[in-house]
Amino acid sequence: MHILIATDAQWVVNEVKAALDSPSTTFAVLSNGREVAPAVAANTPDIAILDMQVGSMGGMAITMDLRLDQSSGALPKVPVLMLLDRVADVHMARRSGADGWTIKPLDSLRLRKAVTAIAGGGCYAEGIPTPDLEEETAEEAVAEDATVTEEVAAEAVAAADTVAQ
């Protein structure tokens, strides 16, 4: 398995590697969010693990950038696990198009469980803060948000076309 990690915090790299390292696992570690899309284009990972805060381009912006490039066919679909700082960030993770998220502090069991689910084509969600959403499965939440993300991406492309004219 090839895992891309985007974070500027060495402790996050250490935690993720400790939880997921195996003889068949390789890691690409990036400390600048702007490097993620080119890295995906060069060597598509099985999963991208994105810290919510990564220098000048955080996990939400990185995920939205990836999803926009994927919707245009410029990049292949890459499953994204976002590492959130707090429960309040769940809304942003859902809206960005992430396939799953976990809330820090990290632990090996939850990381392995999340990566297994997401890399296998599923979803993983923690900390959905509103009672009416607790019954919604992670897959339903991500599917709903993917539609919203596609609509936002289409609006962004239309706006860019208008500006270009």
Regions found by a protein language model. Give the residues of each.
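Two-component signal transduction core modules
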Residues: A48, W101-T102
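Alpha4 helix (beta4-alpha4-beta5 surface) of REC/receiver domains from two-component response regulators
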Residues: A61, M82-W101
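C-terminal output helix
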Residues: L106-V115
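Conserved acidic segment of CheY-like receiver
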Residues: M1-L20, A48
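Conserved phosphotransfer microenvironments
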Residues: D46, L50-L68
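CheY-like receiver
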Residues: G122-Q165
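His-Asp phosphorelay/catalytic-motif detector in bacterial-type signaling
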Residues: S71-P79
